[in-house]
Amino acid sequence: MVGTRVAPIFPVTDLAAALAYYRGLGFGAREWHGGGYGFLTFEGVEIHLGAEPDLGKRPDRRATAYLFVEDADALARAWLAAGAEVRSPEDTEWGQHEGVLIDPDGNMIRFGSPMP
């Protein structure tokens, strides 16, 4: 049977720092009680974090997730105000107004809202 949920796993060098970073952006964030793994939630979306201390030596180990949001511009402003690296949303030929958040480990959250 096929499930109804998907959660991308972002590799991170320092789990505690990554959890704090995402908390600062408005995510719910908690560490798995066994350590080495964490969970983020944001408006019904879940992203997992997996600790990989040697991540800096593996540039091929990055992940991307896409968030469908109501207002990409408002989200970009909020994340920029929190100090995040954000590429401001732009209109795309496929009808989305999209931006990109790049976390300190190089993982990306692309986010977009429908163009008017």
Regions found by a protein language model. Give the residues of each.
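Short, charged/polar, Gly/Pro-enriched secondary-structure boundary elements
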Residues: V45-L49, K57, G106-I109
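Eukaryotic phosphotyrosine signaling hubs
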Residues: R5-A7, R62-T64
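Short beta->alpha transition motifs characteristic of CBS
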Residues: I9, V100, F111-P116
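Active-site beta-strand termini and strand-to-loop segments that position acidic
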Residues: L40-V45, L101-P104, P114
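Core segments of cupin and vicinal oxygen chelate
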Residues: V2, I9-I47, E52
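Residue-level detector of high-confidence beta-strand sites
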Residues: R30-W32, P89, F111
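Vicinal oxygen chelate
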Residues: D14-L15, A65-M108
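A short acidic/small-residue loop/turn micro-motif
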Residues: L55, E93-W94, M115-P116
